[in-house]
């Protein structure tokens, strides 16, 4: 099972927020996930990113691959993501 760390869209129409989730790469974007490790709200000024760092680092050490968008959000937050 290939595991990805990616964004799952939540919220109302035209007012999205996102959960940062760990899921199987074959699951739908907003479908089944293994764990919620954070959230991202682009509607706030400035955009708000909250992450459970210990859980995120544990999943990264287990081999989970973040998507490009998630890795950029984590870099802005100051969390090193392996290349």
From Swiss-Prot:
Keywords per UniProt: Ribonucleoprotein, Ribosomal protein
Pfam family, one: Ribosomal_S16
Tagged with keyword Nucleotide-binding: no
Cellular component aspect of the GO annotation: cytoplasm; small ribosomal subunit
PROSITE patterns in the record: RIBOSOMAL_S16
GO biological process, one term: translation
GO molecular-function terms, A-Z: structural constituent of ribosome
UniProt-listed Gene3D superfamilies: 3.30.1320.10
Family: Belongs to the bacterial ribosomal protein bS16 family.
Protein name per UniProt: Small ribosomal subunit protein bS16
Organism expressing this protein natively: Syntrophus aciditrophicus (strain SB)
High-level lineage: Bacteria, Pseudomonadati, Thermodesulfobacteriota, Syntrophia, Syntrophales
């Amino acid at each position: 099972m290939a595991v990805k760390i990616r964004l799952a869209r939540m919220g109302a129409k035209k007012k999205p927020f996102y959960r940062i989730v760990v899921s199987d790469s074959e699951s739908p974007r907003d479908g089944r996930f293994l764990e919620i490790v954070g959230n991202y709200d682009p509607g706030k000024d400035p955009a708000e990113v909250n992450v459970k760092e210990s859980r995120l680092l544990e999943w990264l050490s287990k081999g989970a691959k973040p998507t490009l968008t998630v890795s950029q959000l984590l870099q802005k937050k100051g969390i090193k993501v392996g290349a």
